[in-house]
């Protein structure tokens, strides 16, 4: 029998301490206004654990790496991905994608598509990633101002749709990116998400997401119908889904809705997190020019003017450190929720069935007792020669345990190839005074799109040129110079 909110309320004296909740709404106000700052302040004030209330329902916040291991790795079956607040799984509005299903159903369907993410299969996607990235670069020119947020969303959507579903969406990237932005970008605050508010009208975040989802339904169901009429085996995720066994009864296949929800999940999660990781990385590199110069030096030394290949990536260790550090500071997946499915005891605290538990990458990735200069962007901390020991569970941008993001190898390869290809040619430089802000929804997005001027790439031996270029760019922006005039000046400066 499901545990009710009222029953959970009776256990509040057994849970860890936390700030006093307001009647009826609990801590919804700080969760809505500044969830990132609120979670960090709770950790500083209460230490390893804290309890807050989402309305009348308690949520236990776990702030230590050992808690991450306990929940995600050591006892994953004690913690469900769905809770009593999320409604009946038979609800037609409940997603049946890999991110939301649980138990044996999740294990069975994950196994069905796992071959698409094996090492050799993922490596076969490298040619597609590089092809689409080079096609994008051919449309860019030094001096152009580019919406990097939008460009990375469309590029990663283009790549994931081809790699996983063998479809070329080049003619539909704009509308599809808008639709996914409607699902993810209009995702509600942490407070509304935790309450699972489902009011389908144009005002609510849920209503906006539903409207955007309906735009994608026609594309996805058409794709399924076309594949059913196609006898070829594409050896892609869609083929695997269509031949996968259902978990309800032996010999059954996945339903149309289940296949639809898997496709939607892979398309959304498969492009959004990588795009955000890249945007945050470009922003950090603009704030730490010494890191950017060192990375571009490494790229230039290894590639010697060639387009990057899969084999080149093994010779770019600093690239990996930069991406690791970027996802430590600005993890695209910044929060993970679980619900206690089997009564558990953690650090002497009893967690009753139905209790919501919260693990935050944003907080744990910044714990000062684990990360020296935790707020600083220091890729060198990932150099094995430095001897820094990172405890298991202290870094989990892709989750952990049996629910580790299935697309992690693909996302890592994609980010490495895209970042290398762009930095080989350009240095994206945001306008002076640009402040990204935070939009912590399903993912941790910059609140303001990153619009950047494409400076020609350079290395440490041309740093004086960079200073001159930066001054020229600042002057052009301040004086409102015409874009073409600014571009011509940039090209002239570099003799292009």
What positions do the PLM features span?
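Cytochrome P450 fold signature focused on the C-terminal beta-domain
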Residues: 231-236, 296-316, 329-349, 358, ...
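N-terminal membrane-proximal hinge/A-helix region immediately C-terminal to the signal-anchor transmembrane segment
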Residues: 2-94, 101-108, 123, 127-135, ...
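Conserved cytochrome P450 K-helix/beta-meander segment immediately N-terminal to the heme-binding cysteine loop
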Residues: 76, 359-387, 468-469
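Cytochrome P450 proximal C-terminal region
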Residues: 2-7, 12, 43, 133, ...
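Cytochrome P450 heme-thiolate "Cys pocket" and heme-binding signature region
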Residues: 94-95, 108, 264, 269, ...
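Cytochrome P450 heme-thiolate monooxygenase catalytic core
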Residues: 2-13, 39, 80-91, 105, ...
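Conserved cytochrome P450 K-helix E-x-x-R motif and the immediately C-terminal K′/meander segment
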Residues: 28-47, 218, 222, 306-347
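Cytochrome P450 catalytic-core helices
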Residues: 273-298, 409-424
